[in-house]
């Protein structure tokens, strides 16, 4: 499985979950009903909420996704890791911003990953490839 396929699989799993968006009176009322029934409600991002079950599933899906990438790094699967870095660099317009933080966040890492010499070499290869492919 390449990175794009992994990401699409992750997205399908996330899309199967039930989230509430508290942007309308109806959904705010639903949140209050859950709380009144002593159910835990979690704020997951940008006005989205999940009950305990969906929150736990989201965390598990995310952990599985990130662990898959970590294992590919541990295995030194250059094709997969370079493809993942390239994909996220493209997704976050890295050639313009040169903001590694957004790319790393999408992959489940922070700047500490650059302490891994092998990863840094693969990052550099993906960056060079992207810059040569980019339509300036």
Task: Kindly give the residue locations of the regions a language model identified.
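Soluble, non-transmembrane alpha-helical interaction regions
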Residues: 1-136
């Amino acid at each position: 499985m390449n990175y794009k396929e992994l990401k699409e699989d992750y997205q399908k799993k996330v899309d199967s979950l039930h989230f509430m968006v508290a942007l309308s009176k109806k959904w705010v009322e639903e949140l209050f009903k859950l709380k009144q029934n002593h159910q835990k409600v979690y704020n997951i991002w940008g006005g989205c909420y999940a009950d305990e079950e969906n929150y736990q599933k989201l965390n598990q899906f995310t952990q599985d996704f990130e662990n898959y990438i970590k294992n590919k790094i541990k295995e030194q699967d250059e094709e997969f890791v370079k493809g993942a870095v390239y994909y996220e660099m493209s997704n976050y317009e890295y050639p313009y911003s040169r903001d590694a933080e957004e790319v790393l966040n999408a992959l489940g890492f922070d700047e500490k990953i650059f302490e891994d010499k092998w990863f840094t070499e693969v990052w550099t290869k993906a960056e060079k490839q992207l810059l040569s492919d980019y339509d300036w």
